[in-house]
Amino acid sequence: AGRGKQGGKVRAKAKTRSSRAGLQFPVGRVHRLLRKGNY
């Protein structure tokens, strides 16, 4: 219930962390797809 209120604050404070997580998230997803697709 309080996730939306905390999300804004956490997002503003974890700006650098968000950037790092965003980079690791897609990379992991792409890596998994690449491995499954045998590209």
Curated annotation (Swiss-Prot):
Keywords: Acetylation, Antibiotic, Antimicrobial, Chromosome, DNA-binding, Fungicide, Hydroxylation, Isopeptide bond, Nucleosome core, Nucleus, Ubl conjugation
Residues in coiled coil: none
Annotated spans, Disordered: 1-24
Localisation: Nucleus; Chromosome
Compositional bias annotation for Basic residues: 1-18
Residue location of crosslink Glycyl lysine isopeptide (Lys-Gly) (interchain with G-Cter in ubiquitin): 13, 15
Main location: nucleus
List of residues that carry N6-succinyllysine: 9
Modified residues (N6-acetyllysine): 5
Any GO MF annotation of the entry: DNA binding
Modified residues (N6-lactoyllysine): 9
An example Gene Ontology biological process: defense response to bacterium
Superkingdom of origin: Eukaryota
GO CC aspect terms: nucleosome; nucleus
N6-(2-hydroxyisobutyryl)lysine modification, residue list: 5, 9, 36
Changes after translation: Monoubiquitination of C-terminus gives a specific tag for epigenetic transcriptional repression. Following DNA double-strand breaks (DSBs), it is ubiquitinated through 'Lys-63' linkage of ubiquitin moieties.
Similarity remark: Belongs to the histone H2A family.
Purpose: Core component of nucleosome. Nucleosomes wrap and compact DNA into chromatin, limiting DNA accessibility to the cellular machineries which require DNA as a template. Histones thereby play a central role in transcription regulation, DNA repair, DNA replication and chromosomal stability. DNA accessibility is regulated via a complex set of post-translational modifications of histones, also called histone code, and nucleosome remodeling.
Subunit relationships: The nucleosome is a histone octamer containing two molecules each of H2A, H2B, H3 and H4 assembled in one H3-H4 heterotetramer and two H2A-H2B heterodimers. The octamer wraps approximately 147 bp of DNA.
Record protein name field: Histone H2A
Species this chain originates from: Bufo gargarizans (Asian toad)
Lineage: Eukaryota, Metazoa, Chordata, Craniata, Vertebrata
